[in-house]
Protein backbone atom coordinates (compact mmCIF):
# COMPACT_ATOMS: atom_id res chain seq x y z
CA UNK A 1 0.00 0.00 0.00
CA UNK A 2 1.26 3.47 -0.90
CA UNK A 3 2.15 5.98 1.78
CA UNK A 4 -0.71 8.38 2.47
CA UNK A 5 -0.16 12.13 2.59
CA UNK A 6 -2.75 14.68 3.73
CA UNK A 7 -3.23 18.04 2.02
CA UNK A 8 -5.56 20.70 3.41
CA UNK A 9 -6.10 24.44 3.34
CA UNK A 10 -5.28 27.04 5.97
CA UNK A 11 -8.77 27.12 7.52
CA UNK A 12 -8.36 24.00 9.70
CA UNK A 13 -6.94 25.96 12.67
CA UNK A 14 -4.60 23.09 13.52
CA UNK A 15 -1.34 24.15 15.15
CA UNK A 16 1.78 24.49 13.04
CA UNK A 17 3.38 21.88 15.30
CA UNK A 18 0.62 19.33 14.64
CA UNK A 19 0.73 19.94 10.89
CA UNK A 20 4.51 19.51 10.83
CA UNK A 21 4.46 16.45 13.11
CA UNK A 22 2.05 14.65 10.77
CA UNK A 23 3.56 15.93 7.50
CA UNK A 24 0.30 17.65 6.52
CA UNK A 25 0.70 19.96 3.53
CA UNK A 26 -1.22 23.24 3.72
CA UNK A 27 -2.35 25.31 0.76
CA UNK A 28 -3.15 28.76 2.17
CA UNK A 29 -6.08 30.98 1.31
CA UNK A 30 -5.47 34.65 0.57
CA UNK A 31 -6.94 37.38 2.75
CA UNK A 32 -7.52 41.04 2.02
CA UNK A 33 -8.02 43.27 5.04
CA UNK A 34 -8.73 46.95 4.45
CA UNK A 35 -7.09 46.65 1.02
CA UNK A 36 -3.91 44.92 2.24
CA UNK A 37 -3.20 41.34 1.11
CA UNK A 38 -2.12 38.55 3.45
CA UNK A 39 -1.40 34.85 3.12
CA UNK A 40 -3.51 33.05 5.73
CA UNK A 41 -1.48 31.48 8.55
CA UNK A 42 1.79 32.78 7.08
CA UNK A 43 1.35 36.56 7.27
CA UNK A 44 -1.52 36.61 9.75
CA UNK A 45 -2.79 34.28 12.48
CA UNK A 46 -6.38 33.21 13.06
CA UNK A 47 -6.61 35.36 16.19
CA UNK A 48 -5.34 38.43 14.32
CA UNK A 49 -7.84 37.75 11.54
CA UNK A 50 -10.69 37.51 14.08
CA UNK A 51 -9.52 40.76 15.72
CA UNK A 52 -9.86 42.52 12.36
CA UNK A 53 -13.38 41.13 11.90
CA UNK A 54 -14.40 42.20 15.42
CA UNK A 55 -13.06 45.70 14.68
CA UNK A 56 -15.28 45.92 11.57
CA UNK A 57 -12.42 45.86 9.07
CA UNK A 58 -13.22 45.24 5.41
CA UNK A 59 -12.27 41.55 5.25
CA UNK A 60 -12.34 39.33 2.16
CA UNK A 61 -11.03 35.84 1.52
CA UNK A 62 -9.93 34.28 -1.74
CA UNK A 63 -9.45 30.62 -2.63
CA UNK A 64 -5.96 29.48 -3.55
CA UNK A 65 -5.15 29.56 -7.27
CA UNK A 66 -5.37 26.22 -9.08
CA UNK A 67 -1.63 26.39 -9.76
CA UNK A 68 -0.88 26.01 -6.03
CA UNK A 69 -2.86 22.77 -5.96
CA UNK A 70 -1.29 21.45 -9.16
CA UNK A 71 2.22 22.28 -7.91
CA UNK A 72 1.61 20.57 -4.55
CA UNK A 73 -0.05 17.50 -6.07
CA UNK A 74 2.68 17.09 -8.72
CA UNK A 75 5.44 17.39 -6.13
CA UNK A 76 3.82 14.80 -3.84
CA UNK A 77 2.80 12.44 -6.67
CA UNK A 78 6.46 12.06 -7.68
CA UNK A 79 6.91 9.88 -4.59
CA UNK A 80 4.09 7.51 -5.62
CA UNK A 81 1.90 8.32 -2.61
CA UNK A 82 -1.84 8.37 -2.02
CA UNK A 83 -2.88 12.00 -1.57
CA UNK A 84 -5.87 12.71 0.67
CA UNK A 85 -6.85 16.33 0.06
CA UNK A 86 -9.52 17.63 2.47
CA UNK A 87 -10.83 21.19 2.39
CA UNK A 88 -13.30 23.65 3.82
CA UNK A 89 -16.96 23.40 2.86
CA UNK A 90 -17.77 23.83 -0.83
CA UNK A 91 -20.74 25.88 0.36
CA UNK A 92 -18.39 28.54 1.73
CA UNK A 93 -15.60 28.62 -0.85
CA UNK A 94 -14.56 27.40 -4.26
CA UNK A 95 -11.44 25.82 -2.71
CA UNK A 96 -12.84 22.27 -2.84
CA UNK A 97 -13.88 22.62 -6.50
CA UNK A 98 -10.47 24.03 -7.40
CA UNK A 99 -8.81 21.07 -5.65
CA UNK A 100 -11.01 18.66 -7.63
CA UNK A 101 -10.11 20.36 -10.93
CA UNK A 102 -6.40 20.25 -10.07
CA UNK A 103 -6.62 16.57 -9.11
CA UNK A 104 -7.88 15.79 -12.63
CA UNK A 105 -4.90 17.62 -14.14
CA UNK A 106 -2.24 15.66 -12.24
CA UNK A 107 -1.22 12.06 -12.80
CA UNK A 108 -1.49 10.72 -9.28
CA UNK A 109 -3.63 8.89 -6.75
CA UNK A 110 -5.58 11.85 -5.35
CA UNK A 111 -8.80 11.79 -3.34
CA UNK A 112 -10.42 15.18 -2.71
CA UNK A 113 -12.86 15.48 0.20
CA UNK A 114 -15.39 18.24 0.89
CA UNK A 115 -15.34 18.46 4.69
CA UNK A 116 -18.65 20.36 4.71
CA UNK A 117 -17.03 22.23 7.58
CA UNK A 118 -14.44 24.86 8.51
CA UNK A 119 -12.11 25.66 11.38
CA UNK A 120 -12.34 23.16 14.25
CA UNK A 121 -14.77 20.95 12.30
CA UNK A 122 -12.24 20.61 9.48
CA UNK A 123 -9.42 20.15 11.96
CA UNK A 124 -11.32 17.38 13.73
CA UNK A 125 -11.82 15.51 10.46
CA UNK A 126 -8.13 15.85 9.63
CA UNK A 127 -7.21 14.43 13.04
CA UNK A 128 -9.49 11.46 12.39
CA UNK A 129 -7.84 10.84 9.01
CA UNK A 130 -4.41 11.02 10.69
CA UNK A 131 -5.53 8.38 13.21
CA UNK A 132 -6.83 6.11 10.44
CA UNK A 133 -3.61 6.49 8.45
CA UNK A 134 -1.53 5.68 11.55
CA UNK A 135 -3.69 2.66 12.31
CA UNK A 136 -3.40 1.43 8.71
CA UNK A 137 0.38 1.83 8.75
CA UNK A 138 0.61 -0.35 11.88
CA UNK A 139 -1.32 -3.16 10.15
CA UNK A 140 1.18 -3.38 7.31
Curated annotation (Swiss-Prot):
Signal peptide range: none
The keyword Cell inner membrane appears for this protein: no
Sequence ranges assigned to domain DegV in this UniProt record: 4-140
InterPro entries per the UniProt record, alphabetical: DegV, DegV_domain_contain
Binding residue positions for hexadecanoate: 61, 93
Pfam families, per the entry: DegV
Gene Ontology molecular functions: lipid binding
PROSITE patterns registered for this protein in UniProt: DEGV (PS51482)
Keywords: Lipid-binding, Plasmid
Domain of life: Bacteria
Function: May bind long-chain fatty acids, such as palmitate, and may play a role in lipid transport or fatty acid metabolism.
Protein name: DegV domain-containing 15.5 kDa protein
Organism annotation: Staphylococcus aureus
Amino acid sequence: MAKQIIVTDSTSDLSHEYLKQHNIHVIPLSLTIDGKSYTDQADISSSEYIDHIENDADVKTSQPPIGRFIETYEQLAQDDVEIISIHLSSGLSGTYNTAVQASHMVDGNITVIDSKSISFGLGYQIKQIVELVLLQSKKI
